Amino acid sequence: MKKSRSVMTVMADDNVKDYFECSLSKSYSSSSNTLGIDLWRGRRCCSGNLQLPPLSQRQSERARTPEGDGISRPTTLPLTTLPSIAITTVSQECFDVENGPSPGRSPLDPQASSSAGLVLHATFPGHSQRRESFLYRSDSDYDLSPKAMSRNSSLPSEQHGDDLIVTPFAQVLASLRSVRNNFTILTNLHGTSNKRSPAASQPPVSRVNPQEESYQKLAMETLEELDWCLDQLETIQTYRSVSEMASNKFKRMLNRELTHLSEMSRSGNQVSEYISNTFLDKQNDVEIPSPTQKDREKKKKQQLMTQISGVKKLMHSSSLNNTSISRFGVNTENEDHLAKELEDLNKWGLNIFNVAGYSHNRPLTCIMYAIFQERDLLKTFRISSDTFITYMMTLEDHYHSDVAYHNSLHAADVAQSTHVLLSTPALDAVFTDLEILAAIFAAAIHDVDHPGVSNQFLINTNSELALMYNDESVLENHHLAVGFKLLQEEHCDIFMNLTKKQRQTLRKMVIDMVLATDMSKHMSLLADLKTMVETKKVTSSGVLLLDNYTDRIQVLRNMVHCADLSNPTKSLELYRQWTDRIMEEFFQQGDKERERGMEISPMCDKHTASVEKSQVGFIDYIVHPLWETWADLVQPDAQDILDTLEDNRNWYQSMIPQSPSPPLDEQNRDCQGLMEKFQFELTLDEEDSEGPEKEGEGHSYFSSTKTLCVIDPENRDSLGETDIDIATEDKSPVDT
């Protein structure tokens, strides 16, 4: 199954309404057969025209919380038309993974020797209503600087559907294009640059009389848009990437969501802490206990840190040769059953548990051998079957069978999921064979020798691994070291026939992909991908060119990351088994922390953890935004995955046990405590309400709610202490 390079195109309808008329009536343009949507209230479609609400309305959002809209979670609208994708394949020998396409040709040139472009179009996949992730809520309430006015949608483009643009850099580009279009209207000039105003997509422009009120209105709106863009550009820190703007924004929004979640209940607070500690790259101060004299003496006797721990001497090659290798790479008495399961090798949701049962608990070796045969990678890279099986068995033996989740079963599942994602119609002919080899290999080794505890546990316990890797992606660095070290074992070098350049490039790609499985890097990965996709959406071409290493590895990193977080997108039967396993591993870590007298990590205390609520939060704040962004890249290929994800989320939501009402005396104590807790914040609010805050005299406070205990004064004597109403009004947190 060789892969070759491609240019992907989808043709869009050219039925575009008059831009000027639309700008007066709606302050944004609409194209083709799109549906009218109140975009700034949180509804969007999978693809289509990029929309921008009036600036005045965006500014007014600063005084309105997301809850004020009465919409708890944005949703999409059902659309009916499927996009048509035309793939033009090109010889992959013409493409250099690191250097990109041959010079001198545009990637869109039909005679170009190579490049891949994902063209986002104005035709849409049909799907049922589906909730949107928190990324599409307004971020206005989180911004304090007058230069940080945020918007939650984008402006018109004739090449896309009604997508909301949420990444800051793409919003700036979209706004500048709006300014340019308005300028052509105000001056009655027609642009001549094909790059910025393709003739095919240029909307008809009406002549405007400078004396008309509409002219003055449009001029003022244009000036305000330009001022907004300048304010945004002035705040950009030049030493940081533009995608970091999106990463910081998403982190602010997630922190806001987690604050609300933590205030709802004790279990909600635990889920909030787990998500924050695991998926946000927080540089927390860590108390590392000082080693005792006995510990120091013990460490002197330990092996040098330059040696890679966890590598065992195993012999699998003595009994292997090309004639003795079985059909699926493993010895089994259930070959027919195994063959039946592997019929789903190219499908999303293969039952890896059955594969493990029929392969004598060799799921990784079995799956990898099947994938390499399916893709003809053994022949392409001249890998002998016995060398491949020897390496895979050695690798699988370095996964710990006593670890409930991060074992060879999980590695096999991620490898198979990556294999399917690589075969997605939108990406099927995009990546080279070397990139495919690197992605599948990275998935196979990404958790090897996992001890069943988190990076933070290793850091907190002053482990050798944490010291070796300076607390940075400790386990991920270790997985890479072990995975590559095993290639040096006898009869294990599956890359021996690669050229020096191929080997160096593969190693570089594998390192990038495995390091991306560090969950603390999740928000940065998400922001990078979303910024890349949305930036291309607002350009005149609307083409996502994968013609350089940075863009290509960015897609591959997110692909492996998606595969690593794919459990909630599988069938409920499989998802529940994975959930049971990860919770068992969490609880085992919690027991170790309890034995050591350490603070138990969130979701690791088997006595207090809420499994159902943790899965709902995991989907809402981590999995859904990631897969939603991936679906934007490869649409409509991921629609079924999103549907399954929503079904699973709803099932776990329905299984959350209803908490009983607390005793009345506890309510009284809570109310009294709340009055004492929020008295200071109420005083600040009253002071703020007396007038505008003076420059340089701002207050810093943390309360996100005002809580009042109300007692009817006329019936105070006749009421017991339990007759108390608690009125709560949500307020936005203020960070300084």
From Swiss-Prot:
SMART domains named among the record's database cross-references: HDc (SM00471)
Tissue expression as described in the entry: Expressed in brain, heart, lung and skeletal muscle. Expressed in white blood cells.
Gene Ontology annotations of biological process type: cAMP catabolic process; cAMP-mediated signaling; cellular response to epinephrine stimulus; cellular response to lipopolysaccharide; cellular response to xenobiotic stimulus; leukocyte migration; negative regulation of adenylate cyclase-activating adrenergic receptor signaling pathway; negative regulation of relaxation of cardiac muscle
Cofactor(s) listed in the protein's UniProt record: Zn(2+); Mg(2+); Mn(2+)
MF annotations from Gene Ontology: 3',5'-cyclic-AMP phosphodiesterase activity; 3',5'-cyclic-GMP phosphodiesterase activity; calcium channel regulator activity; cAMP binding; gamma-tubulin binding; metal ion binding; transmembrane transporter binding
Binding, AMP: 406, 410, 447, 564, 615, 618
Activity-regulation annotation: Inhibited by rolipram.
Chain positions recorded as Mg(2+) binding sites: 447
UniProtKB keywords: cAMP, Cell membrane, Cytoplasm, Hydrolase, Membrane, Metal-binding, Phosphoprotein, Zinc
Binding, Mn(2+): 447
Keyword Acyltransferase: no
Residue numbers binding Zn(2+) 2: 447
PANTHER family cross-referenced by the UniProt entry: CYCLIC NUCLEOTIDE PHOSPHODIESTERASE
Family membership noted in the UniProt record: Belongs to the cyclic nucleotide phosphodiesterase family. PDE4 subfamily.
Protein's name in the database: 3',5'-cyclic-AMP phosphodiesterase 4B
